Amino acid sequence: MQTTIIVATHKPYWVPDDPMYLPVQMGHAVHPACGYIGDDTGDNISERNANFCELTGLYWAAHNIDSDYIGIVHYRRYFASRRKSRFADKKSRVISHEELCSILATTNVVLPKERHYFIETNYTQYIHAHHKQDLEVTRAIIARKCPEYLPRMTCICPRPTATTSTCSS
């Protein structure tokens, strides 16, 4: 099974020694090159990186990579192996292609474990780290185009939980 996990990055950094991982520079069209393949070849939205961040790389991968499975991780956050102790060296805990394939044999989507943040909610975390207006515009678009999804957004935003990576390097 061909699996490609793009490693979203903007600078040189350690990448697992597994051919499944492909480091891709996000926003390559608008930022200085860092030595990795950029998200600005083929069908791409690299020039919109300021608005879409890592999604420019995911868009690039979906339109330019021929793989059975395509995924994305942040350059410092990888999926952790279930087979290794959580006290092991973080770099040795990164999930391998073999282990990921065994998981994908039973499911189509792999997500990290949910983490609980008691200091703030998903909504307050987003507006502190990003732009409140973006979230409000997103809510308005959902209300207008897909109103059946609005109760879910209303449910998720006040929660103090999020799905994030469990293995940071």
Describe the function of each predicted region.
Residues 1-169:
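ER/Golgi luminal nucleotide-sugar-dependent glycosyltransferases, focusing on the catalytic module
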